[in-house]
Amino acid sequence: MKLLHLTTALYLAATTGIASAQDPNLARNLAASCANCHGTNGNAVVGSGMAPLAGVDKGRLLQAIKDFKSGAKPATIMHQIAKGYSDEQMDLIASFFAVQK
């Protein structure tokens, strides 16, 4: 499972930079990989123990992702996944979840 997340993150990081200016669905597509743990559109399954992402303040979520990436915030898998995203991609993901309900 960890390898799948890491592979997905690295693939997206390698291929989406070129497409970012052309794909209006890029934020949604990047955020889709988060559904594996955090639920569809960031609506975590009740009782799963996973934090919901839908409606979380963009700045707060962006800082959390950056903290996972830098290692400042401990995690089991997020520190690996976050390393696969550029700053621009993390901003898109945080923006996407901030407007979800």
Where would I find each of the regions flagged by the language model?
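Sec-dependent signal peptide recognition
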Residues: 2-9
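N-terminal signal peptide c-region/cleavage motif recognized by signal peptidases
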Residues: 14-16
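Local sequence-structure signature of Cys/Sec-based thiol-disulfide redox active-site neighborhoods
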Residues: 25-31
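Gly/Gly-Pro-rich "capping" loops immediately C-terminal to redox-active cysteine motifs
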Residues: 27, 42-69, 79, 83
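The canonical Cys-X-X-Cys-His
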Residues: 32-40, 93
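Detector for the c-type heme attachment site
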Residues: 38-44, 98-99
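C-terminal capping alpha-helices of c-type cytochrome domains
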Residues: 70-73, 82-101
